[in-house]
């Protein structure tokens, strides 16, 4: 099993923590990670685009001129697609772009990105992140003590609301729990800051 250093909130190394090789030590599968990232990005699309077809455009109920005898082309409505201000043919309608991948694929992708971060030495384990009250300055001190100055995903245990509230005003910092951290979040971050309790939860969920 791989060992990573365990730090406290002041940046002092207090011990080490063993990581499960079946989760944090596998050969990353880039193809699977790519598929999951594309799936999660697709799910983020709003899909609220819409246009009006000829039945939705206002007006056009009356035939513009009689069928025969005018010398002009026959027309049934001024809202036909060929008219200016008419309905759109086969235009976009609101829809969801999201699609689901098999659970095994999603789990393998998570294991792959966690393993990649550990292998690249971009995985920082911390004993805990506890704050008496939501305080952005306190969270910034923790990051400074741990020499984290790049885009970071902080993974905490369930119920640690003060950590999330303390970090929400910091640029390039995102907080997630062990069960909500996504492959897209991990790929988009330069470093992972994970609490000891969150590591246990990750190993429990992905085992």
Swiss-Prot record:
One of its GO terms (biological process) is translation. Keywords: Ribonucleoprotein, Ribosomal protein, RNA-binding, rRNA-binding. GO terms for molecular function: rRNA binding; structural constituent of ribosome. Gene3D superfamilies: 3.40.1370.10. Transmembrane segments: none annotated. GO terms for cellular component: ribonucleoprotein complex; ribosome. SUPFAM superfamilies: Ribosomal protein L4 (SSF52166). Residues 49-78 are annotated as: Disordered. Coiled coil: none annotated. Signal peptide: none annotated. Part of the 50S ribosomal subunit. Belongs to the universal ribosomal protein uL4 family. One of the primary rRNA binding proteins, this protein initially binds near the 5'-end of the 23S rRNA. It is important during the early stages of 50S assembly. It makes multiple contacts with different domains of the 23S rRNA in the assembled 50S subunit and ribosome. Forms part of the polypeptide exit tunnel. HAMAP family: Ribosomal_uL4_B. This is Large ribosomal subunit protein uL4. The gene is rplD.
